[in-house]
Amino acid sequence: ASRSQAEDVRVEGAFPVTMLPGDGVGPELMAAVGVIECLKLGDGLFLQCCEEVAELYPKNIANPTATLLASCMMLDHLKTSDMGGYATCQDFTEAVIGALSHP
């Protein structure tokens, strides 16, 4: 059976882009790394793959790199028309606000 784009997880970061089966394995494998962001292309879900951040938050030592990189990927994915996309400025802003409102 062939996999659709919706079943793939695109992984970027310190390593070359890797396509993984959409079985949830990718985020678990990279959770230990803490600075890898990934994007599930099928539904536009952006993950920061750093589960340990919740444990480190009270100590004020959590590394925000993965969260920032995932945010950059989201902004790149939500292209406005001047960047080759179809979103208006308002569409783009509302999408970002919506994502911030629903972590």
Swiss-Prot record:
Major place of localization? mitochondrion
Q: Which GO terms describe its molecular function?
A: enzyme activator activity
Full protein name: Isocitrate dehydrogenase [NAD] subunit beta, mitochondrial
- Highest taxon of source: Eukaryota
Q: Which residues form a coiled coil?
A: none
* GO BP term (any one): tricarboxylic acid cycle
Please give the function described in this protein's UniProt entry. Plays a structural role to facilitate the assembly and ensure the full activity of the enzyme catalyzing the decarboxylation of isocitrate (ICT) into alpha-ketoglutarate. The heterodimer composed of the alpha (IDH3A) and beta (IDH3B) subunits and the heterodimer composed of the alpha (IDH3A) and gamma (IDH3G) subunits, have considerable basal activity but the full activity of the heterotetramer (containing two subunits of IDH3A, one of IDH3B and one of IDH3G) requires the assembly and cooperative function of both heterodimers.
Name the protein family.
Answer: Belongs to the isocitrate and isopropylmalate dehydrogenases family.
How is the quaternary structure described? Heterooligomer of subunits alpha (IDH3A), beta (IDH3B), and gamma (IDH3G) in the apparent ratio of 2:1:1. The heterodimer containing one IDH3A and one IDH3B subunit and the heterodimer containing one IDH3A and one IDH3G subunit assemble into a heterotetramer (which contains two subunits of IDH3A, one of IDH3B and one of IDH3G) and further into the heterooctamer.
Annotated localization: Mitochondrion
One cellular-component annotation, GO: mitochondrion
Q: How is its activity regulated?
A: The heterotetramer and the heterodimer composed of IDH3A and IDH3G subunits can be allosterically activated by citrate (CIT) or/and ADP, and the two activators can act independently or synergistically. The heterodimer composed of IDH3A and IDH3B subunits cannot be allosterically regulated and the allosteric regulation of the heterotetramer is through the IDH3G subunit and not the IDH3B subunit.
- Which cysteines are cross-linked by disulfides? none
Keyword terms: Mitochondrion, Tricarboxylic acid cycle
The yes or no answer to whether the keyword Mitochondrion is present is: yes
Phylogenetic lineage: Eukaryota, Metazoa, Chordata, Craniata, Vertebrata
PANTHER family linked to this entry? DECARBOXYLATING DEHYDROGENASES-ISOCITRATE, ISOPROPYLMALATE, TARTRATE (PTHR11835), ISOCITRATE DEHYDROGENASE [NAD] SUBUNIT, MITOCHONDRIAL (PTHR11835:SF60)
